[in-house]
């Protein structure tokens, strides 16, 4: 309705309307992210942060990233469960249980459940005892790299 009203006014008067200035004290700026650089999962984060991070990089994006057995993989959706019996922090990322459809991943605050349909590439077949892991080098690079884009969508990296 707002767009219709604006278009009606524009076509009647030829004027774009009154500009509304942003108040600096109410403004925030967050730089754009690039999935190839910024989507690495930090397994030391709180379990709820890992869940929201993975789900934020889900479709239409190309998934949150981590490694298993030296292979980069992408996770599209994950669900966290906090429980009274917690795992030791050294167990974080370990696959402690599997079913036909789900992979159960240990975390110090509980566990995460990954549907096998949300793990790519499909050629990766995690086994019990395997660990999802992201190297500190990849995590540091994701924090230290700023991405900017040109108007035509090309990436400009800043470090």
Protein language model features and the residues they cover:
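Active-site-proximal loop/hinge segments within enzyme catalytic domains
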Residues: 1-81, 151-159
């Amino acid at each position: 309705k707002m767009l219709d009203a604006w278009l009606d006014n524009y076509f009647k008067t030829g004027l774009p309307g009154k500009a509304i200035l942003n108040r600096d004290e109410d403004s925030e700026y967050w730089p754009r992210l690039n999935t190839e650089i910024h989507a690495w999962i930090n397994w030391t984060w709180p379990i709820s942060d890992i869940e929201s991070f993975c789900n934020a990089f889900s479709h239409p994006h190309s998934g949150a990233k981590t490694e298993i057995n030296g292979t980069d993989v992408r996770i599209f959706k994950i669900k966290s469960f906090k429980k009274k019996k917690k795992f030791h922090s050294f167990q974080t990322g370990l696959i402690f249980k599997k079913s036909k459809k789900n992979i159960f991943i240990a975390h110090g605050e509980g566990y995460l459940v990954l549907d096998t349909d949300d793990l790519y590439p499909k050629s990766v077949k995690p086994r019990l005892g395997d660990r999802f892991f992201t190297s500190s080098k990849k995590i540091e690079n994701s924090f230290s790299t700023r991405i900017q884009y040109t108007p035509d969508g090309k990436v400009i990296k800043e470090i």
